[in-house]
Structure formats: C-alpha cells, structure tokens
C-alpha cells in the first residue's frame, strides 16, 4: 500500500512539474510569436458542426502598431481603464463588483484585460472554479513575462468579435471593409461596445443597448466629435455593413 502511494505521489509530482514547465514554455513562446490557435476558437468551431450553421475560424494577426490607437483607447475605457496601473488584478474593481452584485440581478464582472487574455489564449470558455484558478495562474505568468504592450497586442488579436471572427483586424475587414489601422473612433467604440458578450451583442446588428454603450465609450475616447441626436451612430463615417448592402441590393 505504501509503495502504491509513493508511486502515485511521484506521478502527481511529475504531472505538476510537466504542467508548470509546458505552461511556462507556451507563455514565453507567445511573448514573441503570434498565437496560432486558441482553445476557444476550436471549441466554437467544433460545436457549430451540430448547430444551425457551421462557423469557421477567421483571424488575421497584425502587430499593435497596425491597430488604430482609437481601438486601444476604446478597449481600455470599456474593459480595463487601470490596465497600465495594476499587475493583472484590479482589486478595487473586484471590490466594487462584489458590492454591486449583492444588490443587482445582472452580475458585473471585474476581469482585467490580462485575465481575459489568459482565458482566451489558454483556457476554455465555461465558468468554473478550476478555470478561474488556472486563469489566475496564467495571469501571473503573463504579467511576469510580457510587457503591457504585448498583452494588449495579443488581446486585440484573439478576442471573439462575432461568430467565427477573432481579432480586431478580422472584424475590421468583415464589418467595415478596412484594416484595423484605418478604423475611426465610431467604429472603434462599436467594437469595444460588444466586448462584454460578443456572442450576445453583435457589431453588424447592434441593439439599442450596444448603441448606447458605444456612445458612452465614444464620449470618453473622443469627446470633441459631434454626436448624433437620434437613435444610432451607424450612419456616420462609412459605418455600412454587409447586411445593409444585401438589403439595398434586393
């Protein structure tokens, strides 16, 4: 019995060491090379086989300097305005979210951009305690080995922005027919507006909630830009989608 326990303990130690070495290796690798594929991309694509429509993987990696500064500003304002101040965990935001969630049915999150990057690059989408623990682990590794600019670059290249669409460049080409470096503040704010839940909120079919959120983000990113008085900002500055083009052709 004792020998079995010793053997099991050795295997556990080996498994833990293997996980630590391999995870650290991938984190260090992605510090320098583009992320080719993520678990989320695979899970979404495979699960769509049994759905109404197959969803492929559309992505196009670009360096941070080829993404419009307005996109970076919009994402920071919408998701993590203290990104350059914290070390991966925003404890003030966590405390505020806990207080808010005690009195509201709609729960509020406090994940930082680094935490979202850790989840998007290395983990699965379903929420559970194991994933949250691993998310914290990868967040610490990322913050310890990547500069903030690299974290932002990876984040903007792997985030889900519609069915089968990953990264700002792929979203820019699909929805706006332009590269990410040519996005204007309106488009950048619309992209940031769907980030809380890109499966529920759509860039090509924005709800009133998304449009309202877009306005608030835009006010923070570019307060000097004139705002629309009526329902939507989508008529401004070439905000024309495939769906609108299809309707006009019919």
From Swiss-Prot:
Leading EC class = transferase
Transmembrane portions of the chain: 15-35
Q: Catalyzes what? A: [GlcNAc-(1->4)-Mur2Ac(oyl-L-Ala-gamma-D-Glu-L-Lys-D-Ala-D-Ala)](n)-di-trans,octa-cis-undecaprenyl diphosphate + beta-D-GlcNAc-(1->4)-Mur2Ac(oyl-L-Ala-gamma-D-Glu-L-Lys-D-Ala-D-Ala)-di-trans,octa-cis-undecaprenyl diphosphate = [GlcNAc-(1->4)-Mur2Ac(oyl-L-Ala-gamma-D-Glu-L-Lys-D-Ala-D-Ala)](n+1)-di-trans,octa-cis-undecaprenyl diphosphate + di-trans,octa-cis-undecaprenyl diphosphate + H(+)
Q: Name one GO cellular component term.
A: peptidoglycan-based cell wall
Please name one Pfam family that this protein belongs to.
Transgly
- Pathway as given in its UniProt record: Cell wall biogenesis; peptidoglycan biosynthesis
Q: Name one GO molecular function term.
A: pentosyltransferase activity
Q: What is its main location?
A: membrane
A GO biological-process term: cell wall organization
- Keywords, in A-Z order: Cell inner membrane, Cell membrane, Cell shape, Cell wall biogenesis/degradation, Glycosyltransferase, Membrane, Peptidoglycan synthesis, Transferase, Transmembrane, Transmembrane helix
The record's section on InterPro entries has: Glyco_trans_51, Lysozyme-like_dom_sf, PBP_transglycosylase, Pep_trsgly
Q: How does it sit in the bilayer?
A: Single-pass membrane protein
Question: Is Cell inner membrane one of the keywords UniProt gives this record?
Answer: yes
Instruction: Check the record and name the SUPFAM superfamilies matching this protein.
Output: Lysozyme-like
Q: Where in the cell is it found?
A: Cell inner membrane
What EC designation does it have?
2.4.99.28
What the protein does comes down to: Peptidoglycan polymerase that catalyzes glycan chain elongation from lipid-linked precursors.
Q: Which family does it belong to?
A: Belongs to the glycosyltransferase 51 family.
Official protein name in the record? Biosynthetic peptidoglycan transglycosylase
